[in-house]
Amino acid sequence: MHYGAATHIQNSRSHGLETVPGHQRLERGAGGETPEFPGCHSPAPPENFGNELLPLSAPLQGLSEGLYPPGRNKTLPAGVLREGAVQFLHRGLCNSNLSSEASARPSGTQDELHSSRRKTGQTRREGARKHLVCSFRLYPFTVHTVSPGNSHLALYQVFKAVKLCPSETSFFLSRKSLKSSDPWHPPSLSPNSWNRQAGFRAWSSHLISLSLTCSDSQSRRVSSSQQPPLHSLSSHRRAAHVPE
């Protein structure tokens, strides 16, 4: 045996690194990707699933990248996407709320406190908008997979799942604050006669009004009393988007 090889084997044994018989060594590819272990396979998605659906938004796209390795273009199965999206949304909103609550108790002058409250309000409004966008993206998958033919039931299931986030529970459960825009009675959509352009235009208008309502509620809660509320502006916009 060659002297160098014998020395390498001896050093490996002394450090407890002796190779086990039958062990396959994993090496990184040219792109830095680690190959999958034998026997580990992702569940195969349905053949026609996702053909009529919109592409994922940024938060859900990040979720899909976490489920599958880079460089693999796979359609997520319905159950995986629905459960994963709710968990991802819940985790993201909770992290946002923790950072907001931490910044809501600073020590400093009155001006610093006022500035911190403004930043907290902006953070919560941004979180509310992302919340609604995720709900909007989750709805088409739910209406096609959970309750086809019943858009109202699908919407109820989406909001029921999304309201897991504690800070937004009051918004999704309070029908008084929604006034002319009620999430429990959205624009009528039927998958049997699905018109994507008209349907999503109606839903865009519906969610814009919801987003403005949520923004008004959060801004009134955290903003200073000297700042004029945005309620009048959102009321005009809601009236423009809601059919009479």
Swiss-Prot record:
It comes from the Eukaryota. It is found in: Nucleus; Cytoplasm. GO terms for biological process: auditory behavior; cochlea development; cochlea morphogenesis; craniofacial suture morphogenesis; genitalia development; genitalia morphogenesis; hard palate morphogenesis; inner ear development. Residues 99-110 have a biased composition (Polar residues). GO terms for cellular component: cytoplasm; nuclear body; nucleoplasm. Residues 219-233 have a biased composition (Low complexity). Residues 1-54, 99-126, 219-244 are annotated as: Disordered. Expressed in neurons of the paraventricular nucleus, thalamus and occipital cortex and in glial cells (at protein level). Predominantly expressed in dendritic cells. Detected in brain and skeletal muscle. Highly expressed in mature dendritic cells and at a lower level in immature dendritic cells. Expressed in paraventricular nucleus, supraoptic nucleus and nucleus basalis of Meynert. Strongly expressed in paraventricular nucleus of depressed patients compared to controls. Not expressed in monocytes and B-cells. One of its GO terms (molecular function) is DNA binding. Residues 116-126, 234-244 have a biased composition (Basic residues). Its main location: nucleus. Keywords: Activator, Cytoplasm, DNA-binding, Nucleus, Transcription, Transcription regulation. Binds with and transactivates the corticotropin-releasing hormone (CRH) promoter. This is Dendritic cell nuclear protein 1. It comes from Homo sapiens (Human). The lineage of its organism: Eukaryota, Metazoa, Chordata, Craniata, Vertebrata. The gene is DCANP1.
